[in-house]
């Protein structure tokens, strides 16, 4: 494999820049620009020479294979963060047949050299991208060991089953009833292991999912007031003039250690002469698909006219989301704040201005946000695997040729999870989600 390098510290002002190099020619690259003898795993302070000119003082660390991150020889240059110096060193590396690393290529080489599994790579990626306490707990080393233990057990049990069934195919007369019971029992254990794996992946995918809450409704019903109360800030302008909000205003907040995107929108109305207002309404309608929860606000307690005078395709789009109808200005209506249901639609009477019922509203939002089954398209590979295997277990028969072919397919799918059975496309799609320098 080619020698690769990357700047692993961010661009911009700073005191330090770190350049990481990995490959078989790293020792050769050092000798040309450093006059000192570089020892393994010892930080060496030395001058860097390019064209017999000292360009900088650097801290150099050399890691010898195979006990390195990538499984290859690695060198790290710790130099001053001066763009001229950095460019000189990068040009030197390019002239000596090294190349820029692709996103995630260091970790990809670690995987290709057999030092890590695909599941571990995914856990590392989640740890970097999603910064919350729950994700940290799920991706720490102890959890990683549980994942690997489950996969190891799955592989062992599948191999045992394949061996048993191949023996049965070879000489059925020596295959006893106890052997049949052993196969059924092993199938049952496999299902349990898959269920544990699915539960863990469900939580991880739930934490990865971006959750968006949109506040929709007609003009001057109190959407901006509610937005400010929930976010505990005053980013939306609040007046008694209809149509104050012309564009979508968004704010990120935290609920149950999960980041939520709150969106305040322009009032919905079909007929308007104001061009800016029309553009705002069209944007609202298009953004509905991006929302997970719709808080639809009205200010008159008249269920028949809830969706009066709004765009025709609005209702079709809103059906795809969770929906809570908020009847605002309960203090003016002379009604008590409260909650009730009509035809499985949750309706809450509130007063955004007083804000006394906002805590209760947050509780209902919490329940929807905390619903880990909310996203039905996550962890599809393992879920399909589980469903197929459940059906296979229920329909289990003595047609051992069929059983064996199904098991071998199942074994391949398990190997795809670990990376033992894969192809170039799968590897590329996995590692290109990482940052440069990882």
From Swiss-Prot:
Domain spans labelled TrmE-type G: 210-370
Domain of life: Bacteria
Entry annotated with the keyword Magnesium: yes
Molecular function, one GO term: metal ion binding
Protease listed as a keyword: no
Alphabetized Pfam families for the sequence: MMR_HSR1 (PF01926), TrmE_N (PF10396)
Primary residence: cytoplasm
Enzyme Commission code(s) on record: 3.6.-.-
Function: Exhibits a very high intrinsic GTPase hydrolysis rate. Involved in the addition of a carboxymethylaminomethyl (cmnm) group at the wobble position (U34) of certain tRNAs, forming tRNA-cmnm(5)s(2)U34.
Name listed for the protein in its UniProt record: tRNA modification GTPase MnmE
Protein species of origin: Carsonella ruddii (strain PV)
């Amino acid at each position: 494999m080619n020698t690769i390098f990357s700047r692993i510290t961010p661009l911009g002002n700073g005191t330090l820049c770190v350049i990481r190099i990995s490959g078989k020619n790293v020792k050769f690259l050092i000798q040309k620009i450093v006059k000192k003898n570089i020892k393994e795993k010892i930080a060496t302070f030395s001058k860097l020479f390019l064209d017999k000119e000292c360009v900088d003082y650097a801290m150099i660390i050399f890691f010898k294979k195979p006990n390195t991150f990538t499984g290859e020889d690695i060198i790290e240059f710790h130099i001053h963060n001066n763009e001229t110096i950095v460019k000189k060193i990068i040009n030197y590396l390019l002239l000596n047949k090294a190349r820029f690393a692709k996103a995630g290529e260091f970790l990809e080489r670690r995987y290709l050299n057999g030092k890590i599994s695909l599941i571990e790579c995914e856990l590392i990626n989640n740890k970097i991208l999603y910064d919350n306490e729950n994700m940290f707990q799920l991706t720490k080393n102890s959890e990683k060991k549980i994942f690997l233990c489950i996969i190891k057990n799955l592989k062992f049990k599948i191999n045992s089953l394949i061996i048993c069934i191949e023996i049965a195919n070879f000489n059925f007369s020596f295959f006893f009833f106890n052997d049949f019971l052993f196969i059924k029992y092993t199938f049952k254990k496999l299902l349990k292991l898959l269920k544990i794996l699915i539960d863990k992946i469900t939580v991880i995918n739930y934490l990865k999912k971006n959750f968006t809450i949109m506040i929709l409704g007609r003009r001057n019903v109190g959407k901006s007031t509610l937005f400010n109360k929930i976010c505990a800030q005053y980013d939306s302008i609040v007046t008694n003039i209809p149509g104050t909000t012309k564009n979508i205003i968004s704010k990120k907040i935290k609920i149950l250690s999960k980041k939520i995107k709150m969106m305040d929108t322009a009032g919905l109305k079909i007929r308007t002469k104001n061009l800016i207002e029309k553009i705002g309404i069209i944007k609202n309608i298009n953004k509905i698909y991006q929302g997970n929860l719709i808080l639809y606000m009205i200010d008159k307690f008249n269920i028949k006219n809830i969706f009066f005078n709004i765009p025709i395709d609005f209702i079709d789009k809103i059906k795809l989301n969770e929906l809570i109808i908020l009847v605002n200005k309960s203090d003016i209506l002379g009604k008590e704040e409260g909650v009730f249901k009509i035809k499985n639609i949750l309706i809450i009477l509130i007063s955004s201005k007083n804000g006394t019922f906002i805590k209760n509203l947050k509780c209902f939002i919490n329940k929807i946000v905390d619903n880990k089954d909310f996203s039905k398209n996550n962890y599809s590979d393992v879920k399909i695997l589980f469903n197929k295997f459940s059906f296979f277990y229920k329909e289990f028969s003595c047609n051992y040729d069929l059983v064996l072919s199904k098991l071998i397919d199942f074994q391949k799918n398990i190997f795809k999870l670990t990376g033992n059975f894969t192809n170039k496309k799968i590897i590329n799609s996995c590692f290109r989600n990482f940052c440069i320098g990882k």
